[in-house]
Amino acid sequence: MKKEKRQRLIKQFVKEYEIEKQERLVELLAKKDVLVTQATVSRDIRELNLTKVPSQEGLMIYKIFSEEHLQTDIKLKKKLREVVVKIDCVEQLMVIKTLPGNAHVIGVLFDELDWKEKIGCICGNDTCLIISQSKSDREILEERLNLII
């Protein structure tokens, strides 16, 4: 089977099922008479920009990192430029002050991006607290934001 068709099937499986392991993709492909190795599936995953994200049940499952995340990144850039008043940082914490009524939007966009340096957001009316695991993770987030704003 051609690579394009196999990858199309993989994308379909990722959309239809909660796939935790590459071996599950190998099994699903085999049911469609597509015999491949785990190494081939691994390469396909990389080429398709699949990434593991937490499911609602807390499992780490493959999802397609594509237009949806790209659009969120674009929205965050636009919103940050429009509403951010000030950013302050201390240790692993980043406080983003926004125009009134806009902090929650920033928090939602941060959550949708699922950046690994961020472990959580708490937002009020005009303040969004971004929490990182460490000071170095917070510094990475700060660099990203400074490039955007």
UniProtKB/Swiss-Prot annotation:
UniProt keywords, alphabetically: Arginine metabolism, Cytoplasm, DNA-binding, Transcription, Transcription regulation
Highest taxon of source: Bacteria
GO MF entry, a single one: arginine binding
Family annotation (InterPro entries): Arg_repress (IPR001669), Arg_repress_C (IPR020899), Arg_repress_C_sf (IPR036251), Arg_repress_DNA-bd (IPR020900), WH-like_DNA-bd_sf (IPR036388), WH_DNA-bd_sf (IPR036390)
Main localization of the protein described in the UniProt heading: cytoplasm
UniProt-annotated location(s): Cytoplasm
Summary of the function given for this chain in its UniProt record: Regulates the transcription of the arc operon, involved in arginine catabolism.
Name of the protein described by the UniProt record: Arginine regulator
Gene name tied to this protein: argR1
